[in-house]
Swiss-Prot record:
Region (Disordered): 1-57, 368-456
Effect of residue 252 to R: In pbs1-2; strongly impairs RPS5-mediated plant resistance to P.syringae
Membrane topology field: Lipid-anchor
PANTHER family according to UniProt: OS07G0668900 PROTEIN (PTHR47985), SERINE_THREONINE-PROTEIN KINASE PBS1 (PTHR47985:SF44)
Gene3D superfamilies: Phosphorylase Kinase, domain 1, Transferase(Phosphotransferase) domain 1
Lipidation (N-myristoyl glycine): 2
Protein name (record): Serine/threonine-protein kinase PBS1
Gene expressing this chain: PBS1
Known catalytic reactions: L-seryl-[protein] + ATP = O-phospho-L-seryl-[protein] + ADP + H(+); L-threonyl-[protein] + ATP = O-phospho-L-threonyl-[protein] + ADP + H(+)
Effect caused by changing residue 6 to A: Affects plasma membrane location. Abolishes plasma membrane location
Lineage start: Eukaryota, Viridiplantae, Streptophyta, Embryophyta, Tracheophyta
Occurrences of domain Protein kinase (ranges): 86-363
Listed Basic and acidic residues bias regions: 12-23, 370-392, 400-429
Length: 456
């Protein structure tokens, strides 16, 4: 699915004031980036940006080198040679605003991915500039590494580290019949890693960066299925000061866009959280965000899944059949709770991505062992039966009571249970650290006493 511009929203890129702000102050040491880029920076300590009205504003970059564009500048002939003149055999696929090729740099022998932007694209140049700047300033293990770029004449190319396992979309929706589907543990690991990349953009960059095109095809996989976010051409700087959103022309991918952004053009970090929820649902269900080949009523993933969230007896139906039942039922419920909270229609009710990272890190650490499947499945089924009895007025309502008093509260109740488990895990970890610290202090004290006695 490609990018689209929907509705006839204003092209204004200014920040609109509103009454409240959900974003705290960022530390001065955080990476600083500039918006509305008109050209690549020359390496100075300031980046200038121009608003539609023509007025300039300057964003100071840290003096620790973040302001320097570290990416290497390539000549077009170097990249043509690396890709055998963009031979069809080196073609990897379509990326945002261009085609991606596999290449090998003659100078270093490094295998790379080369994205050649569409020279006829109306926005290709802006997206090129944004991506070069973003990936040059922002570095994180879950963001793809930009090696360099080419801006010879009208040529616009980006050179990335090569991600050998392709995209998450490949493994979820384009998997050959002879290939094994991602297992439950790997899906949770990928979700947690992708969320960490998004958290870095939202909470560590200053001002925050809104990704704006979070989707399964933009999550690339390295060796070991380590996920990295790619394609930053649509990224926008988030609101600053007392602003709570950015007003911009609606861009993104159908099926992933948050409803408030699609309708009003008002963009916040919670817009990314919605998109993350859609991708997380793809991981859980194995379904596409939009699939025209599915029966009527099941073509839109979110619209299909939402009613199922209100009936715990149907939770199992949300699991990807290719998992073949090899997943912990309780973890499935918890994962669905996270997804449900992320795709809430009201942006204010969605969690912050930092909270999502906490929840998914917990789930990713609860490794599922297929060899223990039978006993665990029996325990989960007993818990499910307790829930059923509770519906009829009996039973104890155990920790598998995911819904509480009303069905519509089930995602919230599950989130509460998940938070309780996370808090318990934190408490145990803190207790261990405290115990280790206390033992170390005692050891040092005893050692000091022993040395004192020996000298006496």
């Amino acid at each position: 699915m490609g990018c689209f511009s929907c509705f006839d929203s204003s092209d204004d890129e200014k920040l609109n004031p509103v009454d409240e702000s959900n974003h705290g102050q960022k530390k001065q040491s955080q990476p600083t980036v500039s918006n509305n880029i008109s050209g690549l920076p020359s390496g100075g300590e300031k980046l200038s940006s121009k608003t539609n009205g023509g007025s300039k504003r300057e964003l100071l970059l840290p003096r620790d080198g973040l302001g320097q564009i570290a990416a290497h500048t390539f000549a077009f002939r170097e990249l043509a040679a690396a890709t055998m003149n963009f031979h069809p055999d080196t073609f990897l696929g379509e990326g945002g605003f261009g085609r991606v090729y596999k290449g090998r740099l003659d100078s270093t022998g490094q295998v790379v991915a080369v994205k050649q932007l569409d020279r006829n694209g109306l926005q290709g140049n802006r997206e090129f500039l944004v991506e070069v700047l973003m990936l040059s300033l922002l570095h994180h293990p879950n963001l793809v590494n930009l090696i360099g770029y080419c801006a010879d004449g009208d040529q616009r190319l980006l050179v990335y580290e090569f991600m050998p396992l392709g995209s998450l979309e490949d493994h979820l929706h384009d998997l050959p019949p002879d290939k094994e589907a991602l297992d439950w543990n790997m899906r949770m690991k990928i979700a947690a890693g992708a969320a960490k990349g998004l958290e870095f953009l939202h909470d560590k960059a200053n001002p925050p960066v809104i990704y704006r095109d979070f989707k399964s095809s933009n999550i690339l996989l390295d060796e070991g299925f380590h996920p990295k976010l790619s394609d930053f051409g649509l990224a926008k700087l988030g609101p600053t000061g007392d602003k709570s959103h950015v007003s911009t022309r609606v861009m993104g991918t159908y099926g992933y866009c948050a409803p408030e952004y699609a309708m009003t053009g008002q963009l916040t970090v919670k817009s990314d959280v919605y998109s993350f929820g859609v991708v997380f649902l793809e991981l859980i269900t194995g379904r596409k965000a939009i699939d025209s080949e599915m029966p009527h009523g099941e073509q839109n993933l979110v619209a299909w899944a939402r009613p199922l969230f209100n009936d715990r007896r149907k939770f199992i139906k949300l699991a990807d059949p290719r998992l073949k039942g090899r997943f912990p039922t309780r973890a499935l419920y918890q994962a669905l709770a996270v997804a449900s909270m992320c795709i809430q229609e009201q942006a204010a009710t969605r969690p912050l991505i930092a909270d999502v990272v906490t929840a998914l890190s917990y789930l990713a650490n609860q490794a599922y062992d297929p060899s223990k499947d039978d006993s665990r499945r029996n325990r989960d089924e007993r818990g499910a039966r307790l829930i059923t009895r509770n519906d009829d007025g009996g039973g104890s309502g155990s920790k598998f009571d995911l819904e509480g008093s009303e069905k519509e509260d089930s995602p919230r109740e599950t989130a509460r249970i998940l938070n309780r488990d996370i808090n318990r895990e934190r408490a145990v970890a803190e207790a261990k650290m405290w115990g280790e610290s206390l033992r170390e202090k005692r050891r040092q004290s005893e050692q000091g006493t022993s040395e004192s006695n020996s000298t006496g």
